[in-house]
C-alpha cells in the first residue's frame, strides 16, 4: 500500500490521538473533580487518572502504528502501555517517582481497566464508526 493511500488513515489517527490527549488535559486542567462530593470526590482523585492516562497512551501509540509496524496489533499497544504504567507504579514502592508518589495495587488494576476501555473504543467504536480507521495491513 502506498503512502498516498495511508494519508487519510494517518490523519484520522492523529485527530483521535490528539483529541484524546486534549480531553485528558482539560479534565486535569479544569479540575472537574472539585465539583464532586463525598466518596465520589475521593474515588475521582484516587483513580480517574489511572483510568484515562492508559487510554491516552494507547491512542498515542495508535497514531504511530501505520509507520511503526510492531504497533499494529492491539495487544502489543496494550502490553506496552500496561508495562510502562505498572513499572511506574512499582517504582513508587521504592520511592522512585514518575507519574505519582504513592504505591497502590488498585492503581495497577485501574490501569488494566483503562486499557480495556481503550481496546473497546478502538475495536468496537472506532473501527465500526470512523471512516479510514481500519486499513489493510
Predicted regions mapped to residue ranges:
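Bulky hydrophobic segments
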Residues: 1-137
